[in-house]
Amino acid sequence: MSFRHIGQCVLLWLGGFCAFSCSVKEDRSDCPCSLALDLREVPSAVPEDAFPVRWHLSQGAWSDTGLLSKEDCETGVFHVAMPRGGAQVYAVTGDDGMFNAGLEIEPGHGCPPVRLWTAAIDARGENAQATVRLRKMYCRLTIRLTGTPASRPYRFVLEGGVSGYDTSGYPVPGFFRCRPDPSPGQAGKTDWTACLPRQRDDSLLLHICDLNAGEETPPLRTFALGQIIAAAGYDWTAADLEDLTLDLDFAASTLILGTDRWTRTLSFEIIL
């Protein structure tokens, strides 16, 4: 069964449950379990444009899935009838339907702006419950470059060692490479942005390349970005990943890394 609207959920569930249930006089060990998913924390954790939230419940060969709108989540609790036993459940948004048996980031792309919650459910009794807490599983990195000749355009390449998430939401080791997208920034400058997955170590690299050079041309400069982020005190294990801003000023030979809460300034030597 799949219930996509909370308003219909109780009636549908009760109707299906009658054909799928037991009387009090019968052995109730084969009766289904009623799983209640508490959605009250979802509306405040998910931006308006990130709905609907997709949920998926699986137990062996059995599975059920559906979509939840913001209005659905604001009603509070969502009920699902399921076979008894252990089960896995997840709720996800921002993944473009890519999260199934985990999430694999496509080569050449950044991490999708995914918010995720996963849990193991003990559904051996007649009732079970869980609270859905969607977590921000990506870091939006914004790069700003100043102090370079306007006649020499650049591009950036990010490389790292995490290529996605497993079914429990843990980072999966693998090759990651993407080119941040340019967009108009402040004061006529260009911002480059890319979404990074949760990191397992500090191996993340930032390459600065000549825009007109071929893909095989060595970069003009490589920054050990993972080490810089670690030295700044950024927490990749936080429940919700913070976004980062990286300001590179080649005229002043400074690098400023920051979030909404703090900034760190480092010096470097470079000739481009």
Regions found by a protein language model. Name each.
Residues 137-159:
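Extracytoplasmic beta-rich ectodomain segments of secreted or membrane-anchored proteins
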Residues 257-272:
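Short, low-complexity, Pro/Ser/Thr/Gly-rich segments in the mature regions of secreted, periplasmic
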Residues 130-138, 196:
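Conserved "repeat-terminator" motif of extracellular CCP/Sushi domains
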Residues 51-103, 154-231, 270-272:
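Tryptophan-paired
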Residues 1-10:
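Bacterial N-terminal signal peptides that target proteins for export
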Residues 95-129, 213-252:
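Structured interaction patches on ligand/partner-binding surfaces of diverse proteins
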Residues 38-51, 144-151:
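Structural motif
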Residues 2-3, 15-43, 265, 269:
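Bacterial Sec-dependent N-terminal signal peptides
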